[in-house]
Swiss-Prot record:
Belongs to the FKBP-type PPIase family. Tig subfamily. This is Trigger factor. It comes from Vesicomyosocius okutanii subsp. Calyptogena okutanii (strain HA). GO terms for cellular component: cytoplasm. One of its GO terms (molecular function) is ribosome binding. It comes from the Bacteria. Gene3D superfamilies: 3.10.50.40, Trigger factor ribosome-binding domain (3.30.70.1050), Trigger factor, C-terminal domain (1.10.3120.10).
Amino acid sequence: MKTSLETLKGLSRSLTIDLPIDIFNQKMDKILQKMALEVNIDGFRKGKVPISIVRKRFGNNANSDVINEIVNETLTDALAQVKLTPVAQPVITKVDSNSNKNFSYTVEFEVFPKIKIADFSELSIEQTKVNITKADEQKTLDGLKDRLTEYKAVQCKSKMGDRLSIDFKGLINGETFDGGEAKDFKIVLGKGSMIKGFEEGLIDVAYSSRVVLDLTFPKDYYMDKLASKDVTFEININEIASPKELKLDETFAKKFGEKNMNALRVSMKEQMRVEVDGRIGHLNKNAIFDKLTTANPFNVPQHSIDNEAQNLFKAMQDRMQHQGLSTQGEMPITAFNDEAQRRVKLGLLVNQISRDYKLSVSMKQIDEKLKEISKTYGENAQQMIDFYNQDPTRKSSIELLVVEKMVQDLILDKAQVTFKQKKFQEITQ
C-alpha cells in the first residue's frame, strides 16, 4: 500500500491510497460469484447465470460494495502510516479502478491543530472580588419583605413607598414611541424602576389627578434609540395604595421555610454567597479563558464548529419549545458560528493543557463539584445529585468542569493577576 498526502487549506488534508489492482479484482470476482449463485435472471437456471451476465447487470452495485470494503479494510492503516487522526470520518472524493496495475482512492478530512500553549506567565488577567456588606443583606431582606407586602388603597396624597396604579403616555417631539405607554401600570415610589425624575414627580400627588413630566432618558439607556432623548410623560393617577405593616417575626420567617428570623438571615446570607460565587466564578472563568484563547491563535476544525453550532441551535429550539414559544423564524444556525468556534477552541486548549500537565480527576473531586453545584438548586439539591448518580456517564460533564477549574488554577498560579472589587448589586443585577 502506498500513500500520498496533500495539505489543502487550513486543517484540510487529501490522502490518496494506492493498492494492487489484484486486490480489487479478487474482491469483485468473489462478490460476483456469490451473486451468480443467488440471482434470478430469465433464461437461466438459478445458480447457473454466467459471470459475464452478472457483471453486466450488477457490476455497478458490486463495484460500490467492493470500494466500501477496501476502504474499511485499509483506511485505518493508511492514516496510521501518515500519522494523522481525522476530526471526523474522511469523505471519499475520488476512486480509480480502471488501471491495469493499481486501484486507488482519495479521501479528504480535517485534522486537529498542533497546539503549543503560550507561557502562562505572560498573561495579564483581571479577576473580580465581591464583599457582601450588611447593607447588601438588609437590601436583600427588604426584597423578601416586598414580596409579601400587601397594599391598601388610600385617599391621601402619595408618599415614598406607596404603590400607584397609573396610565401613562410618553411623547418625543409630540410623537408616541414603542413601549412608551401603558394602562393600569403598577409602580412603587422609591424603587427606582423608572428613569430619573419619573417617580420623584409622582410624590405628593392626589388620586385621580393628572401629571405632566418633562424628563430626559439617560445617555446609557438600554434602548439606544431613546438614549439622551427629551421626553414628556402624560400620567393619570388611577389609585394610590399604602403598604400594610409587615412584621419581621417568626410568622414572616416561616413563609420562607425557616423557623425564625435568625435562621432566615443565616439561610439568606448563604444563598447570597452562593449566588455571588456562581456569578463571579462565571465572570472570572471567562476572563481567564478569553486571555488564554487570545494568546493561543490557531485554526479550528470547521467540522467541529458546525457540530457545536448545531448543538447550540438545538439547545435554543428546546428552550423556546419548553417556554411555549414558536421556533418559526428563529435565527439561522450560522448565527451561532462565533460562539461555536470559541467553545471548540477553548475545548482544544483545555485538552492540550490537561495532557501537557498530566491532569487527572478523582471521583472524590467530581462528587465535591456535584455537591457544590447542587447548592444552586435549593430544595431540589438532592434530586439533582441523584439524577447524576443514577447514570455514571452523566458525570462526564461534571468531570469537564473539574478539569476546567484545574486549568484555571494552573493559569492563575503563573499569570500576572490583578483584582477588581465590585459591589454586590453590580454582580447580581
